[in-house]
Amino acid sequence: MKTLLLTLVVVTIVCLDLGYTLLCYKTPSPINAETCPPGENLCYTKMWCDAWCSSRGKVIELGCAATCPSKKPYEEVDCCSTDNCNPHPKLRP
């Protein structure tokens, strides 16, 4: 009986570990944490100025990615790989 219970515990742990998916904050508003699709194991925050930057601030994009998005000269890009590691910059402590 103990062997069966131990086997079930090990199988459960292995199955849960194989099924791990990352949680990232995503835009557009409202900003919610969502499960990333398989293969997308990074969270990212991308910020840039558009034509209305002086009046409303930078455009902020949050999401999941398989690789860190390319950074253009006028953009700020941050990537991370833990659950909910990309909060909206205005909401960071």
Swiss-Prot record:
The keyword Transferase does not apply. Pfam families: Toxin_cobra-type (PF21947). Expressed by the venom gland. It is found in: Secreted. Residues 1-21 form the signal peptide. Disulfide bonds join C24-C43, C36-C64, C49-C53, C68-C79, C80-C85. Keywords: Acetylcholine receptor inhibiting toxin, Disulfide bond, Ion channel impairing toxin, Neurotoxin, Postsynaptic neurotoxin, Secreted, Signal, Toxin. Binds with high affinity to muscular (alpha-1/CHRNA1) and neuronal (alpha-7/CHRNA7) nicotinic acetylcholine receptor (nAChR) and inhibits acetylcholine from binding to the receptor, thereby impairing neuromuscular and neuronal transmission. Belongs to the three-finger toxin family. Long-chain subfamily. Type II alpha-neurotoxin sub-subfamily. This is Alpha-elapitoxin-Oh2a. The lineage of its organism: Eukaryota, Metazoa, Chordata, Craniata, Vertebrata.
